[in-house]
Design a protein with these regions (language model features):
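Active-site and substrate-binding clefts of carbohydrate-active enzymes
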Residues: 1-120
Length: 120
């Protein structure tokens, strides 16, 4: 069962979460993933890529193989660990490689669909 299926079946009977406590093993907040310029720019790129992917999927112009391949790359890019390495609060000493790997996944979404690479 997928989360969407579950919500269709039980969504009306679920309680509303009024407050979501931010937590991680690192700090009890979202600061390591959002807020700094580099982090926010990466989220913007991810968001735009997801929008473009969803539009491509709905268009019916792409094969199942193209959509599935692009979706795999999309899911890999949506892993929260990418955002750990952005900003000044974390330093791997090789942040450039994490940035390139993240952006390569986003590029592969477009390339899997036969679209032009974005300019990032």
């Amino acid at each position: 069962i997928t989360p969407s299926d579950y919500l269709k079946m039980y969504g009306d009977s679920l309680d509303t979460i009024d407050e979501l406590y931010p937590s991680s093993w690192f700090q009890p907040n979202f600061a390591t993933w959002i807020g700094e310029t580099d982090e926010n720019e990466a989220w913007d790129l991810l968001y735009q890529t997801r929008i473009d992917f969803e539009e491509a999927k709905k268009s019916g112009d792409y094969s199942d193989e193209q959509i599935n391949q692009a979706y795999e790359y999309m899911l890999l890019a949506e892993g929260s660990d990418w955002f750990w390495w952005y900003g000044l609060d974390q330093d791997s000493t090789v942040d450039y490689y994490f940035d390139q790997a993240f952006k390569d996944l986003l590029r592969m979404v477009y390339l899997s669909l036969g679209l032009d690479e974005p300019g990032f």
